[in-house]
Amino acid sequence: MHFLIPAAGSGSRMKAGKNKLLIDLEGESLIYWTLKSVFSASSTNWVGIIGQPKDKELLLNSAKNFAHKVHWINGGDTRQESVFNGLKALPKDAEKVLIHDGARCLINPELIDQCANQLDQNEAVILATKVTDTIKIVDNEGFIKETPDRNYLWAAQTPQGFLVDRLKKAHTMAIDKNWKVTDDASLFEMLNWKVKIIEGTYSNIKITSPIDLKIAKLFVKNSTPS
């Protein structure tokens, strides 16, 4: 399975002053823990990191001790542009791809394999969890407009998996139509193409704030042999 990791997080909400994937987590960078999980999945055979040139040396340095090579791909101005760059950099024989947020360093390798396997029956899959909170839709003035039925609400995660040719086509059409999205599954939705949900875990958080980092430290401590 070919695997792309967008890794251009600025770390502004973390107040880190650097790419948040370079922040220390129990003696290693965030991207190290993400790569550790990715390479622990039996389906993984090719990995590309998509990032900004200024971070290339440090990000690849975090990958140097893994047995598998990590390929570098220059990112764009947005996540959407970066993923499209990643797709164009895949080997010509790549038929399927998983795309995973670099900041989701707690991903279970078994879920990665599950996503990969489901691409044998589906052209697009994403990990997601059932929403447990009551969600409110509000107007521009902060007043509640409605409460959607949470039985139909899922919180999207990554990896998100796709047939490569299909996703390339979706990105090309998005450029033509000037569509802006924050994840690749949204492109499929806009084109009325089916995306299969695979139930994920609540521990697969995206590290975006200092409290997220504290949670991640607890998980890493409990999963790392002393």
Swiss-Prot record:
It catalyses: 2-C-methyl-D-erythritol 4-phosphate + CTP + H(+) = 4-CDP-2-C-methyl-D-erythritol + diphosphate. Pathway: Isoprenoid biosynthesis; isopentenyl diphosphate biosynthesis via DXP pathway; isopentenyl diphosphate from 1-deoxy-D-xylulose 5-phosphate: step 2/6. One of its GO terms (biological process) is isopentenyl diphosphate biosynthetic process, methylerythritol 4-phosphate pathway. The record marks R150, K206 as: Positions MEP for the nucleophilic attack. It holds the Pfam family IspD. Its EC number is 2.7.7.60. InterPro entries: IspD (IPR001228), IspD/TarI (IPR034683), IspD/TarI_cytidylyltransf_bact (IPR050088), ISPD_synthase_CS (IPR018294), Nucleotide-diphossugar_trans (IPR029044). The record marks R13, K20 as: Transition state stabilizer. It is an enzyme of class 2 (transferase). Keywords: Isoprene biosynthesis, Nucleotidyltransferase, Transferase. GO terms for molecular function: 2-C-methyl-D-erythritol 4-phosphate cytidylyltransferase activity. Belongs to the IspD/TarI cytidylyltransferase family. IspD subfamily. Catalyzes the formation of 4-diphosphocytidyl-2-C-methyl-D-erythritol from CTP and 2-C-methyl-D-erythritol 4-phosphate (MEP). This is 2-C-methyl-D-erythritol 4-phosphate cytidylyltransferase.
